[in-house]
Amino acid sequence: MIELRGKAVADAHKAILQEKVAAVGDSVITMAVLLVGEDHGAHMYATFMEKTAKNFGYGFVLKQLPETATQDEVVAALKELNDDAAVHGILPLMPMPKHIDTEALIDMLDPKKDIDGLTTYNIGLVTAGKGGFAPCTAKACMAILKHYDIPVEGKHVVVIGRSQVIGKPVALMTLAAHGTVTMCHSRTPDLAEQVKRGDIV
């Protein structure tokens, strides 16, 4: 069994990203984060994203709304980011307050700015194997396999979890790479047995 560590892969990708940002020159690439409410994890992630932007030299915009923000107010904030030509990528942070219809909100996101592959449009492209933006964690899983020179073709891949941002896209991407995929989740019986059968877990 080979345990796959992500740090070496992350370090290599950081160097590549720094080169790409530097190559843009005077043009500023800007990422926007839409943060609604008081979720501690979402606030911590927004802080992390801002620090990352500073470290790499790209622009960062934080659009923050209170817990009491209405659906219309959140939609208006997203539309403003969609329409802003200076913003190149948008990441709506989850979870949002329970009264916000996040599914409806996400599909109002400009697919060209949907950097975490959340929209139905990008999910469809990934599902069809026609590109599109895939969620970053799913892309990271594929990058780790590539870094360690582990072929997916012909392998039995066991994916644990079925979330929209990790499990499902990882399953689709490994399937597109000609793996044989088994998806497991909280209601899968004999999970340990499924894991034993996998070439890649």
Language-model segment annotations:
Residues E73-A85:
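Short, well-structured alpha-helical segments in soluble
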Residues M1-V9, D84, I100-D107:
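Helix-enriched interaction subdomains in cytosolic or periplasmic regions
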Residues A22-M31, G37-N55:
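N-terminal glycine-rich anion-binding loops that anchor highly charged ligand groups
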Residues A53-T68, V181-M183:
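Short beta-strand elements in bilobed, periplasmic/extracellular small-molecule ligand-binding domains
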Residues M1-S27:
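Positively charged, low-complexity intrinsically disordered leader regions
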Residues V36-E50, P135-V201:
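Glycine-rich phosphate/diphosphate-binding loop of Rossmann-like nucleotide-binding domains
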